[in-house]
Amino acid sequence: MDHLPQLVAEARAAIESAEDVQSLDEVRVRYLGKKGEITALLKGLGKLPAEERPKAGEQINDAKQVLSDELEARKKHLQDAELNARLAQERIDVTLPGRGEPTGGLHPVTRTLERIESLFAHIGFDVAVGPELEDDYHNFEALNIPAHHPARGMADTFYFDASRLLRTHTSPVQVRTMKEQAPPIRIVCPGRVYRSDSDLTHTPMFHQVEGLLVDEDVSFADLKGTIEDFLKAFFERESLSVRFRPSYFPFTEPSAEVDIQCVMCGGDGCRVCSHSGWLEVMGCGMVHPEVFRHSGIDAERYTGFAFGMGAERLTMLRYGVNDLRLFFENDLRFLRQFG
């Protein structure tokens, strides 16, 4: 018992000099472990006279408590120091720019659709939509294409049954709008349409935008000016040459195909324009009186014009893409070029 103070002093010095948690644990085992030097004193209490044992036991337990407290305090100090050292090595410079997360972008066809809608919105056109699953009446008959009409052969149609089909154009939206809304009417009708065709320039599903203007005293000159201004704005070429060729559509009379000067060669002739210097981009015409009759509009009072264009076709020309199918293959290497 006489050397207890000396053991405590040695243990405290060893605790203070321990440089890491492992060394500190070795000090604990040496003095307070099952075979530790101070623990051994407790085992030797039986050799003391009975009257000295309580006091000696109390002194040993006090010494153990003091050393346990100092061991715990030293351990916390060493752990904090170790953590601070590790944090210093792993320090993050918060002034560095963060890592950007990859973000998606609009599909090129979606960009084209939004651009078309925006350009026509600037001149007072609203956007109208309708069902993709159509009935025979709105898709054909109301557009002056009755049963057995030769024009029905222009589109290989996906039929569900004798009266239901996937729409072959967005013109039915025009009919539905004219039935529900009195003139004046100014709308563009973007949407998916379906035809049984697939090659470099055709897909079974594609996007079409059709437009309609109905009012009093609307003339072909109004149609011509609207189309020319739109195409120059869309392709961002004020000097773009536009021409109108007589054509035939059952729902317009007169009708015309619209060509623009080839945006690839500037009209000099190239593979894209078949060396003609011109590219066909849309069809148009004055609304046929029969379409007005089916829609409940007085053809004696009102006139109007309609036009239609393929969004993929315009996208190909705007971005220089030579295969329509690329827009639907979901190849990110291709699509990222437009992000």
UniProtKB/Swiss-Prot annotation:
Keywords: Aminoacyl-tRNA synthetase, ATP-binding, Cytoplasm, Ligase, Magnesium, Metal-binding, Nucleotide-binding, Protein biosynthesis
Domain of life: Bacteria
One GO term of the biological process aspect: phenylalanyl-tRNA aminoacylation
GO-annotated molecular function: ATP binding; magnesium ion binding; phenylalanine-tRNA ligase activity; tRNA binding
Catalytic activity annotation: tRNA(Phe) + L-phenylalanine + ATP = L-phenylalanyl-tRNA(Phe) + AMP + diphosphate + H(+)
Amino-acid positions noted as binding Mg(2+) in the UniProt annotation, renumbered to this chain: E253
Location in or out of the cell: Cytoplasm
Coarse class of the protein's main subcellular location: cytoplasm
Hydrolase among keywords: no
NCBIfam families: pheS
Family, similarity comment: Belongs to the class-II aminoacyl-tRNA synthetase family. Phe-tRNA synthetase alpha subunit type 1 subfamily.
Name recorded for this polypeptide: Phenylalanine--tRNA ligase alpha subunit
Species annotation: Chromohalobacter salexigens (strain ATCC BAA-138 / DSM 3043 / CIP 106854 / NCIMB 13768 / 1H11)
Lineage: Bacteria, Pseudomonadati, Pseudomonadota, Gammaproteobacteria, Oceanospirillales
